[in-house]
Regions:
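Small/polar (Gly/Ser/Thr/Ala-rich) solvent-exposed segments
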Residues: 82, 102-123, 133-164, 182, ...
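Bacterial Sec-pathway N-terminal export signals of envelope proteins
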Residues: 19-94, 182, 215, 264-294, ...
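Hydrophobic, lipid-facing positions within transmembrane beta-strands of outer-membrane proteins
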Residues: 126-132, 275, 335-339
Length: 463
């Protein structure tokens, strides 16, 4: 009867612990539908796309050779990427330890003594015992600890990939910022040169008395020239600061950056965002959030396993030249084996508290995972909308620049014919300058939208 009761208790414990062995599965209530909005339909999820812009290797997105060289250098030398790689190594150590927990632990404890009685001949005894202990993972504690360590390692790898994506995006952003500032500097310097010549012309016209040129007109010309000249130091300072920021990203002292020109840049313009489920496998932060949830799931299983018995097998073997009262040589082999079972009965509520904490942490991780998904979809929606808006602005701005240029040319011709004032010439010239600078800014914003979309879709692959 006693044997039957023990058998029944063991069977009950085994059946109730079966779910502890289950691997993590994504919860069914995690929402992946409607993560981001179609910029055409305005409200529905893009489900028809099969190609995914985020799957493109970064070299196919950023084709400027100088930018590619900078990105390669950043991925090799950046302090951030080196720290991320070290974190992966740190996470590999607990995983190795959790795997070795399945192997018996061995301990060697050599001992030796020298003794003498009544000034007699000294006798020497020694023993070389080797002790082994092995925990039988009957209720899944070691298995879940190993799975938790594996999930933590995958989470750290996702963090490393996320660092790569951010480095690529930040390097591209800073590089294109330099190209934008270079173009703005070029436009502003060209305008300043035109205004300088206009001022010299106005001064000569006043001296010659042509078209009744007044001192006020000359001063207006000088003021316009000085205003444009005053903006040049700010642009040059911005260029220097962006170069320094890019050098810092590369882990180098500040220096000038070799680069191309804005007009030569070609970025993708036809995007397939992919179905929302692809965000789960593409975005590193989504991967990391799900691995954090998996880690919390296994931690809950570990907390559950604390309620079940622990069975440990231990044994020892060794050699000794001591056998009771007699001192003998050569050494003899000694061996023993023990099996023990530890069943928690009363732990002052510690195990219950640990389980409650683990369950709460698992729920927190699930909420964080869902929030990360929503944030990913929001970033994709914003990047798509930003690109569409910037494309429309660039198209309209091109028309503005053409019209402003024509207006400036016509006004200058009318002034030369004496049918327009110099104030009108200045106004037209300033409008043209403003339109050109805005066009450059809008072009850069569109490039930023491409980078943001690529990053939001988890881009950054090597191949």
């Amino acid at each position: 009867m006693k044997k039957q009761i023990i058998t029944l208790m063991c069977a009950t414990a085994l059946l109730s612990s079966c779910h502890i062995y289950k691997s993590y599965d994504r919860p069914e209530d995690i929402t992946t539908a409607g993560l981001y909005r179609d910029t055409v339909a305005g409200g529905d999820t893009l489900v028809a796309d099969t190609a995914n812009f985020g799957n493109l290797p970064w070299r196919e997105v950023f084709t400027d050779p100088k930018l590619q060289a900078l990105i390669e250098q950043a991925l090799t030398s950046s302090p951030d990427i080196r720290i991320a790689a070290l974190k992966v190594k740190e996470a590999q150590a607990p995983l190795l330890a959790s795997k070795l927990a399945f192997i018996p632990a061995l301990t060697l404890s050599p001992q030796g003594t020298v003794s003498s009685w009544d000034k007699g001949k000294a006798t020497q005894t020694y023993s070389l015992p080797v002790t082994a202990s092995w925990q039988i993972d009957l209720f899944g504690q070691l298995l879940n600890l190993k799975r938790q360590a594996q999930a933590t390692l995958e989470q750290t790898k996702a963090y490393e990939q996320n660092t790569r994506v951010q480095l690529i995006a930040n390097t591209a952003n800073l590089y294109y910022t330099l190209l934008m500032l270079d173009r703005q500097l070029e436009i502003t310097e060209g305008t300043a040169e035109i205004l300088k010549k206009n001022t010299e012309t106005m001064e000569a016209m006043k001296e010659s008395g042509i078209y009744n040129t007044t001192e006020a007109a000359v001063e207006q010309s000088r003021a316009a020239y000085a205003q444009v000249q005053a903006s040049l130091p700010d642009i040059r300072t911005n260029i220097r600061e962006i170069e320094n920021s890019l050098c810092l990203l590369l882990g180098e002292p500040a220096h000038a950056i070799e680069r191309g020109i804005l007009e030569e840049q070609q970025l993708p313009s036809d995007f397939s965002a992919g179905i929302p489920l692809q965000l789960l496998s593409n975005r590193p932060d989504v991967k990391a959030a799900e691995q954090a949830l998996a880690s919390a799931y296994y931690n809950t299983n570990v907390a559950r396993s604390n309620f079940y018995p622990r069975i440990t097998l231990s044994g020892s073997a060794g050699w000794t030249n001591s056998a009771g009262a007699a001192i003998v040589n050569p050494a003899k082999l000694l061996a023993s084996a023990v099996a023990s079972l530890t069943q928690p009965i009363f732990q002052n509520g510690a195990n219950i508290a640990k389980l409650k904490i683990a369950k709460a942490q698992q729920e927190e991780a699930q909420i964080q995972f869902q929030t990360t998904l929503l944030n990913a979809g929001n970033e994709v929606s914003n990047a798509l909308g930003q690109y569409q808006a910037c494309s429309q602005k660039v198209e309209a701005r091109n028309m503005e620049v053409n019209s402003a240029k024509n207006a400036a040319d016509y006004t200058k011709e009318l002034f030369n014919l004496g049918t327009s004032t110099y104030l009108e010439v200045l106004s037209a010239q300033q409008s043209y300058l403003s339109a050109q600078l805005s066009e450059v800014s809008d072009t850069f914003s569109r490039m930023q939208a491409v980078i943001s979309l690529y990053q939001a879709l988890g881009g950054g692959r090597e191949q």
